[in-house]
Amino acid sequence: MKKILMTIVWILLLQNFHAQSQTDAVPADQIEGFTNTGWKSLNDNVIKMIGTDWMLITAGNIGNYNMMTASWGGLGWLWEKPVAFIFVRPQRYTHEFTEQEEYFTLTFFEETYRKILLNMGSVSGRDFNKMKDSGLSPLATTHGSVAFKEAKIIIECKKIYAANLQQEQFTDKELTQKIYPSGDFHTMYVGEIVNVWKK
């Protein structure tokens, strides 16, 4: 009888612990310190966010990833989905990761991180450990991609289209001479926005 009572007590304790841990746990689509607001919350000035404030494009997993600063891209609506589109040159180390991975993130920071973004865009992760002195703290997202705790906005995207820009498709021929004198045309990636986290 004593053993039966002890077993019942243990079962009740375990059930209570499980219920409490479920209550305390961060939901699967949440990141500690951030709120998953969804794409409809993106009412910021996107041209300013990307074009002048800059962003970090990151691809890979928490054990092996690379990131680069970018100021070309956009957000919009395509194929009945909320999307982000980004451009990565083939010689960039990040290109290897965006080619291989199913997901990538775009992270946006306060102005105080400008110097870090400048550094992330001027050195290659192929030759240097960009994270070493960056002061950034990587974190894993819902789908296993990488973002940073210091970000103010994290956008997680599922890659749904990739294509290399083609010289013959440019209607403004001066652009190819000005932007691509070496012929290193960007790869364009379209990603479905699957998560948006804000502080």
Describe these PLM feature segments.
Residues 1-22:
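Bacterial Sec-dependent N-terminal signal peptides
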Residues 21-199:
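Active-site-proximal mixed secondary-structure blocks
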